[in-house]
């Protein structure tokens, strides 16, 4: 068994991170952009249906209360913060994001958004990626008033940035309804090329705004989500159209990142192969301690994949035995498997290096 896939391997990796990586990396701010996979609660402050503010969301969070995270507990940004010895970043819209809390960083992510501005229009009031960038500029002005412009520029340049986009551009746009506007406008391969082109503009904007170490996650195994199984699967097989979309999108994202890094002249952007990370435990759930990788812990209908996770939904008693928390989102345990690969994974998962290597390189420059 591959040690990185086993419980022992996970513990060894965690020991390495806590005892070796965290002490060597100077405290740095952490900024998060993207969708529901990384939203720490911004949508709780918006009038939108894309919210996770009801029980049983947060059932395993330290406070045992919903926080706006689409998880039973911690999400990917929380676990990255934990691994590098920093507190979780607050949502940018939180009234508590003031004073010294600003220096930790901020989470700008908003459930439902995508690369394109017409993605997630059914959710109406969400923070589209262009607005997230505006908030990042606003954040820098707020911090400049606190510590001065030079120190602010240094804080941003030395920060870690995470961006997670793309899934909703397929699930909540191209494949949202039969004969959607985008599917009539583009054949799938052409749509992917368009998405990658638009994503390139976003990454270059991040660099322009001062980001110098950016982790970019590709789309996960979208067709294997319980919501997709409930709609499209007869025997538990993943929905082929979305799997094909991911197979087209992710390699082109890696190529884009290599191209942008070449333009800049340094490896600012690091690609995470979220699809492969997902497929490892979805294809072999028992190897990771899951009893199922198809049925969501919280939900209703086939695979618990219909509708929202609510107080009256089916709820599994042990979330650690399930890969999916709700119809679309991983459990905290699955998120920990993903972050473990982000931090210590081989070139199969991370390009051009894993996050631990990147951060150790960064620490030598600070």
UniProtKB/Swiss-Prot annotation:
The UniProt keywords, alphabetically, are: Glycoprotein, Hydrolase, Lipid degradation, Lipid metabolism, Secreted, Signal
> What molecular functions are annotated in GO for this chain?
hydrolase activity, acting on ester bonds
Superkingdom in the source lineage? Eukaryota
Secretion signal span: 1-27
What Pfam families would the database entry show? Lipase_GDSL (PF00657)
Residues carrying a glycan: 117, 354
Task: Supply one GO CC term from the record.
Answer: extracellular region
Catalytic residues, chain numbering:
36 (nucleophile), 326, 329
Q: Into which EC class is this enzyme placed? A: hydrolase
Supply the induction statement: By high salinity (LiCl and NaCl). Also induced transiently by salicylic acid (SA).
Q: Which InterPro entries match?
A: GDSL, GDSL_Est/Lipase, SGNH_hydro_sf, SGNH_plant_lipase-like
Swiss-Prot/TrEMBL GO biological process terms: hyperosmotic salinity response; lipid catabolic process; response to lithium ion; response to salicylic acid
Location comes to: Secreted
Record's keyword annotation contains Metal-binding: no
**What EC number(s) are associated with this protein in UniProt?**
3.1.1.-
Task: State which tissues express it.
Answer: Mostly expressed in flowers, reproductive stems and rosette leaves, and, to a lower extent, in roots.
Q: Partners and quaternary state?
A: Binds to VLG at the endomembrane system.
Which family is this protein grouped under?
Answer: Belongs to the 'GDSL' lipolytic enzyme family.
Relate the protein's function as given in its record.
Answer: Involved in the mechanisms of salt tolerance. Mediates resistance to LiCl and NaCl.
List the protein's name. GDSL esterase/lipase LTL1
Q: Which organism is it from?
A: Arabidopsis thaliana
């Amino acid at each position: 068994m591959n040690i990185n896939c086993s419980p022992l391997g996970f513990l060894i990796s965690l020991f390495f991170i806590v005892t070796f990586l965290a002490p060597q990396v100077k405290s740095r701010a952490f900024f998060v952009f993207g969708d529901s996979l990384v939203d720490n609660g911004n949508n709780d402050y918006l009038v939108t249906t894309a919210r996770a503010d009801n029980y049983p969301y947060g059932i395993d969070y330290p406070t045992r209360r919903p926080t706006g995270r689409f998880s039973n507990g911690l999400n990917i940004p929380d676990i990255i913060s934990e691994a590098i010895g920093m507190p979780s970043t607050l949502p940018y819209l939180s009234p508590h994001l003031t004073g010294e809390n600003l220096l930790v960083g901020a989470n700008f992510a908003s459930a439902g958004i995508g690369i394109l501005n017409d993605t997630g229009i059914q959710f109406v009031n969400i923070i589209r990626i262009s607005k997230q960038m505006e908030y990042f500029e606003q954040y820098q002005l707020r911090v400049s008033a606190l510590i001065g412009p030079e120190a602010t520029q240094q804080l941003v340049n030395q920060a870690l940035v995470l961006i997670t986009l793309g899934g909703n551009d397929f699930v909540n746009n191209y494949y949202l309804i039969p004969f959607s506007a985008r599917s009539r406008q583009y054949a799938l391969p052409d749509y992917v090329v368009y998405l990658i082109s638009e994503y390139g503009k976003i990454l270059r904007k991040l660099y322009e705004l001062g980001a110098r170490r950016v982790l970019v996650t590709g789309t996960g195994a979208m067709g294997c989500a319980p919501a997709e199984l409930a709609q499209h699967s007869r025997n538990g097989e993943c929905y082929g159209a979305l799997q094909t979309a991911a197979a087209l999108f992710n390699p082109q994202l890696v190529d884009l990142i290599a191209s942008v890094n070449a333009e800049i002249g340094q490896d600012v952007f690091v690609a995470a192969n979220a699809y492969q990370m997902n497929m490892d435990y979805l294809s072999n759930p028992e190897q990771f301690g899951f009893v199922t990788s198809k049925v969501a812990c919280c939900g209703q209908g086939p695979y618990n994949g219909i509708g929202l996770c609510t107080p009256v939904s089916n709820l599994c008693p042990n979330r650690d035995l399930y890969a999916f928390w709700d119809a679309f989102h991983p459990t905290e345990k699955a998120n920990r498997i993903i972050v473990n690969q982000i931090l210590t994974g081989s070139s199969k998962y991370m390009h051009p290096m894993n996050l631990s290597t990147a951060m150790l390189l960064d620490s030598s420059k600070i």
